């Protein structure tokens, strides 16, 4: 019977790996920051790239067959091989298909999620402050205690999502679909833009939702919505 031991002297923390060090299959760079790197022509087949920051990264000449990109972050400037679909890889970025994804307490500040599909996603406690969520589908998502301060939520489809205790302060909610959300208990809409046409509908919700105190923002949904009246 044999056992395998990790050589701690030769071990390199995955998050410190640089793209120029990539060699061989199953290269481990989990959590590494490769932002704005030109990776060049490299074999990244089977590579572990989950949680990597790939915003602005050029991977267009790489072999990404079987690479694990779950929760890696990309943006519109990320370049990829023509035959690779990052939208269905589990990575986070514009157009990503993340239905039912577990993103509880994730740090998604400033992330570009335009047009992403996050139906039924678990986003409770996630920090989406400053994120771009224009045209994103969040129907059935769990956004309880999520932070969306200053987020761009234009034409975002919230559907039947749960917004209890969510912090939307300063968010742009122009043409966002909020009429069918499950609950706004303790939700703070202070300083939001684009809610003028929905104020009456939101203020007609159950008093249990509207008057629930949010100890973090020190407000209620009712108070925050009424503050938006001209």
Placement of each model-derived feature along the sequence:
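Tandem repeat scaffolds
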Residues: 1-230
């Amino acid at each position: 019977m044999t056992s395998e031991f990790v050589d701690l002297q030769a071990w390199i923390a995955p998050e410190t790996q640089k793209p120029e060090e990539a060699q061989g299959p199953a290269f481990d760079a989990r959590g590494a920051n490769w932002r704005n790197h030109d990776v060049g022509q490299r074999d990244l087949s089977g590579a572990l790239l989950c949680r990597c920051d790939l915003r602005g990264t050029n991977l267009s000449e790489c072999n990404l067959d079987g690479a694990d990109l779950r929760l890696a972050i990309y943006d519109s400037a990320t370049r990829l091989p023509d035959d690779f679909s990052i939208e269905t890889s589990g990575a986070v970025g514009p157009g990503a298909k993340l239905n039912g994804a577990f993103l509880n307490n994730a740090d998604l500040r400033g992330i570009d999620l335009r047009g992403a599909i996050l139906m039924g996603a678990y986003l409770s406690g996630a920090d989406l402050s400053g994120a771009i969520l224009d045209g994103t589908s969040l129907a059935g998502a769990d956004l309880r205690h999520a932070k969306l301060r200053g987020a761009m939520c234009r034409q975002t489809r919230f559907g039947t999502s749960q917004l209890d205790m969510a912090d939307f302060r300063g968010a742009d909610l122009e043409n966002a679909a909020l009429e069918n959300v499950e609950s706004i208990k303790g939700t703070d809409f202070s300083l939001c833009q684009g809610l003028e046409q929905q104020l009456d509908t939101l203020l007609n919700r159950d008093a249990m939702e509207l008057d629930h105190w949010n100890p973090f923002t020190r407000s209620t949904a009712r108070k925050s919505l009424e503050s938006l009246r001209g």
